[in-house]
């Protein structure tokens, strides 16, 4: 079949000369044929059969050569030669299809070739073409239709115009391999034998034959378009029509002169009554196909010319010719309708890799003054040049980091950007400086921190003012714990105040998310004065109770205007706690004996002397606290973490509902804002910072995961 597929392309001229000589000889022999109907039957012993096969095979291959897009492009022969050859040709020879040398007994489609061609020749001999079974012509099998696209249907539609053609060799790229034989469309697998078709041909009138031919042309068109898309979409270029699912590579046109009939496309624009819209199975394009058998010659030629020029247009696209724009500007209706009906997939959005591309520059802010500098970074007061808003710029310290961006700052940015609560400081955005080493967090500006305010105050807060501040603190801590976040560094210097009486929790550098069951964490968290006893004793599994201990220490500091436990070391801190609250034991703190730091001998003090520091009534200037207030403070400073009060339970405590009631935020005392110099001169007593302790141990080479008693 390979020889039949491509071999006839190069010896066309020799075959045509031989066929012309045989055509005149056959015209004489036709008159002496013994069959009464005048229709020739192909015999195995007839010396003319081999010439018929060669001529029919050449013509079948020539038809495919005209349209398959794999080989050479052909031009239609002159009309004088066509008319002369039509007179010499038998009426039934057009229907012989592809004459291959390898088969003799398989049936061929009679309606596809015999009926349509004879109806267009208009000869009455075909109407009486019923023959005896003994001398019936044997048709060649449709081997070509299984392996390659259908012959160009323009030959069938034009009738006398394009029965035969002369090959024209053009320098084209070598043909790609054809699809495999086992990939056969379902439409082409159904064939009819001549025994089933020819009796109906003999009894029909020429008008009926014409209608049958028209319907066969439309069926051919459907089969051809489907086969064309299946066989050629596999070889389409990757850069052609990327937006469409499967690019289409069209077949070559018959002649450049066919483009002159583009103006006739308007008749085939809209489908008439009874037309069916068939979808190409490989390209996603819809093509309007007609099932009406009443449309004849001129309309067929117009439709076929549209398809032919459609193929030529895409060939120009594939070949990269420069006249694409001129051709497309002259196109009408059907090709554009087909293109417009194709839903183009939406392109995926362009994804950026630079994570800091959307960050603003720090130059868009005007620095006013330096507020504070601590372990975690430097804080500036600045003004947004666009909006005029006063904000706080916290610069992340990068010079001490050996492994990239600081983990503490990453956690803080991640948590604060995901939280929004009135009692938690709001981080608006992250801005960058001239390099990646200068990164700033833009936060809302708060005039004071609680520690600086208390140092500036001459008198401690009243109980109503303490209740107002404690309610805001507990609401913020409850929000954190409800979202599975441990702050792990609650202290008065991390509580910000403004002149509207609002309190906000800040500095989430040590905070982290936790889960259930608990996982071991480092105990080097929380500033020493506010660190829970279980952390001081070396436990690694802790939960929200460590934050509630810090809340209790803050409450006591608000009432007394000084820290409750101000030890300088872990041992001294535990000693101060035990002297005030009593030495714990297994009875009041289950699991206490298993803690790592219990091996050290502490002072044995069995009494809780917290009430002595916060009496109900005082004549010596000590801070007073009601029974309900003392109960709340005592439950917050419980040794056993399981019995320690939670934030939700603390908010429901009766102390907040007794007289004096919490003061409104609007009536809270205000203070002038302090700059960095004022803060440094006012702070005489500074609590040890856990990160400073850890950095000091790293410098000394004594990095440990255990506490003092490990």
Swiss-Prot record:
Residues 365-656 form the Protein kinase domain. Its EC number is 2.7.11.22, 2.7.11.23. Residues 299-308 have a biased composition (Acidic residues). The keyword RNA-binding does not apply. ATP binds at residues 371-379, 394. Keywords: ATP-binding, Kinase, Nucleotide-binding, Phosphoprotein, Serine/threonine-protein kinase, Transferase. Residues 170-182 have a biased composition (Pro residues). It is an enzyme of class 2 (transferase). SMART domains: S_TKc. GO terms for molecular function: ATP binding; cyclin-dependent protein serine/threonine kinase activity; protein serine kinase activity; protein serine/threonine kinase activity; RNA polymerase II CTD heptapeptide repeat kinase activity. It catalyses: L-seryl-[protein] + ATP = O-phospho-L-seryl-[protein] + ADP + H(+); L-threonyl-[protein] + ATP = O-phospho-L-threonyl-[protein] + ADP + H(+); [DNA-directed RNA polymerase] + ATP = phospho-[DNA-directed RNA polymerase] + ADP + H(+). Residues 8-30, 41-64, 144-163, 183-195, 209-218, 335-344 have a biased composition (Basic and acidic residues). Induction: Down-regulated by cytokinin. It comes from the Eukaryota. The keyword Nucleotide-binding applies. InterPro entries: CDK, CDK11/PITSLRE_STKc, Kinase-like_dom_sf, Prot_kinase_dom, Ser/Thr_kinase_AS. Residues 31-40 have a biased composition (Basic residues). Residues 124-133 have a biased composition (Low complexity). The modification Phosphoserine is found at residue 516. One of its GO terms (cellular component) is nucleus. The active site is at 489 (proton acceptor). Belongs to the protein kinase superfamily. CMGC Ser/Thr protein kinase family. CDC2/CDKX subfamily. This is Cyclin-dependent kinase G-2. It comes from Oryza sativa subsp. japonica (Rice). The lineage of its organism: Eukaryota, Viridiplantae, Streptophyta, Embryophyta, Tracheophyta.
């Amino acid at each position: 079949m390979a020889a039949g597929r491509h071999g006839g392309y190069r010896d066309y001229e020799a075959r045509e000369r031989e066929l012309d000589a045989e055509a005149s000889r056959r015209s004489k022999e036709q008159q002496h044929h013994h069959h009464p109907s005048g229709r020739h039957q192909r015999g195995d012993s007839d010396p003319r059969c081999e010439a018929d096969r060669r001529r029919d095979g050449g013509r079948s291959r020539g038809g495919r050569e005209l349209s398959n897009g794999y080989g050479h492009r052909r031009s239609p022969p002159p009309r004088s030669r066509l008319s002369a050859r039509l007179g010499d040709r038998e009426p039934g020879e057009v229907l012989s299809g592809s004459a291959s040398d390898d088969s003799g007994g398989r049936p061929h489609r009679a309606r596809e070739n015999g009926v349509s061609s004879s109806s267009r020749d208009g000869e009455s001999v075909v109407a009486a073409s019923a023959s005896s079974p003994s001398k019936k012509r044997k048709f060649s099998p449709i081997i070509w239709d299984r392996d390659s696209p259908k012959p160009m249907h323009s030959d069938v539609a034009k009738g006398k115009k394009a029965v035969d053609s002369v090959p024209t060799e053009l320098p084209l790229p070598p043909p790609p391999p054809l699809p495999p034989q086992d990939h056969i469309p379902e439409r082409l697998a159904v064939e009819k034998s001549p025994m089933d078709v020819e009796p109906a041909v003999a009894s029909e009138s020429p008008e009926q034959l014409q209608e049958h031919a028209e319907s066969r042309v439309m069926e051919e068109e459907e089969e051809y378009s489907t086969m064309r898309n299946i066989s050629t979409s596999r070889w389409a270029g990757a850069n052609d029509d990327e937006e469409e699912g499967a690019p289409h590579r069209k077949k070559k046109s018959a002649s450049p002169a066919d483009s002159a009939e583009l103006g006739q496309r308007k008749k085939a624009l809209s489908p008439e009554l009874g037309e069916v819209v068939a979808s190409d199975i490989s390209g996603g394009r819809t093509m309007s196909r007609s099932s009406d058998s009443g449309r004849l010659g001129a309309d067929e030629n117009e439709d076929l010319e549209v398809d032919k020029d459609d193929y030529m247009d895409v060939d120009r696209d594939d070949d990269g010719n420069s006249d694409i724009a001129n051709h497309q500007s002259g196109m009408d209706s059907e090709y554009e309708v087909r293109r417009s009906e194709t839903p183009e997939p939406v392109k995926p959005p362009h994804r950026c890799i630079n994570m800091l591309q959307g960050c603003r520059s720090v130059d868009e802010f005007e620095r006013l003054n330096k507020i504070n500098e601590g372990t975690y970074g430097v804080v500036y007061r600045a003004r947004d040049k666009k909006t005029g808003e006063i904000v706080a710029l916290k610069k992340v310290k990068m010079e001490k980091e050996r492994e990239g961006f600081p983990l503490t700052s990453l956690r803080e940015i991640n948590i604060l950007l995901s939280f929004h609560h009135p009692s938690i400081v709001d981080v608006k955005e992250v801005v960058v400086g001239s390099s990646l080493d200068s990164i700033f967090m833009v936060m809302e500006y708060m005039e004071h921190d609680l520690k600086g305010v208390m140092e500036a105050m001459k008198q401690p807060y009243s109980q109503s003012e303490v209740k107002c501040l404690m309610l805001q603190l507990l609401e913020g801590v409850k929000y954190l714990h409800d979202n599975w976040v441990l702050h792990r560094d609650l202290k008065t210097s991390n509580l910000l105040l403004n002149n509207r009486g609002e309190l906000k929790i800040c500095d989430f550098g040590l905070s982290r998310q936790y889960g259930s069951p608990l996982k071991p964490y480092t105990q080097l968290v929380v500033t020493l004065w506010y660190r829970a006893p279980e952390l001081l004793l070396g436990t690694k599994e802790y939960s929200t109770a460590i934050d509630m201990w810090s809340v209790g220490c803050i409450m006591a500091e608000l009432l007394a205007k000084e820290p409750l436990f101000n030890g300088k070391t872990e041992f001294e801190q535990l000693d101060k706690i035990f002297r005030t609250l009593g030495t714990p034991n297994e009875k009041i703190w289950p699991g206490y004996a298993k803690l790592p730091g219990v091996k050290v001998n502490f002072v044995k003090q069995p009494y809780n002397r917290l009430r002595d520091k916060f009496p109900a009534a005082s004549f010596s200037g000590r801070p007073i606290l009601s029974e309900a207030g003392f109960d709340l403070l005592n439950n917050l400073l419980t040794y056993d973490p399981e019995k320690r009060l939670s934030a939700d339970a603390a908010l429901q405590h009766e102390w907040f509902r007794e007289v004096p009631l919490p003061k409104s935020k609007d009536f809270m005392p205000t203070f002038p804002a302090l700059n960095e110099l004022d803060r440094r001169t006012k702070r005489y007593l500074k609590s040890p910072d856990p990160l400073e302790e850890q950095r000091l141990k790293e410098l000394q080479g004594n990095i440990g995961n255990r506490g003092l008693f490990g």
